[in-house]
Amino acid sequence: MKDDKIVLYMHAGSGNHGCEAIVNSLCRMLPKPAILMTNRPKEDETYSLKELCSNFVQEKSIEKNVFVHTWYYLKRKLLHDPDCFMEYRYQDICGKNLHRLNISIGGDNYCYDNMLDRLISANRMFHRQGAKTVLYGCSIEPELLKRPEIMEDMKRYDAIVARESLTFAALQEAGIDKNIHLYPDSAFLLETKLAPLPEGWVPGKMLGLNISPMIVDNEKTPGITM
């Protein structure tokens, strides 16, 4: 098992500036160089992460290869191996390439149902192979913690860092009270860059809203957000 670098995984790409900000600020705080597992390396290079991560490792796409997809589907069904898909996707950071510490980029990943299986599988896979995992900078809906598979997943992490008090309190109330920490989103530690204010700006009378592209993408009425 390798101990020279720390792996960051479950990164949704730098086009999602929330993820980019967490990785950017986290890389500046870590005591060792970070390897970033990503499915959008060119996007990450375009934004702020190129000089901060020691290298990018591209996640393997199992869906693009019919033979590979069929083989791993049969392996999962016949051998009852729920994590074999993740072992293929993450082959460059698991198995013989395993690192001791792996940090899951939290953000609001646990707020999306289509992410949950991968989050659980990756955490379980790393632990089965003897590595440690940290869920960093996360927000989790309290209702989600009523699901047994999510509770099992939370208990598997070696440490959890919640980025706001609602998640921290919900974890404690659910019985996850060991090695959990409350710390503001590390994006607040990013270097400040002053920009010219728009015409009509009135100090103390303005309200700024940071609109996620995901909100726009999921509009039920096109254009209603903006």
What are these model-predicted stretches?
Residues 1-226:
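Active-site anion-handling motifs in enzyme catalytic cores
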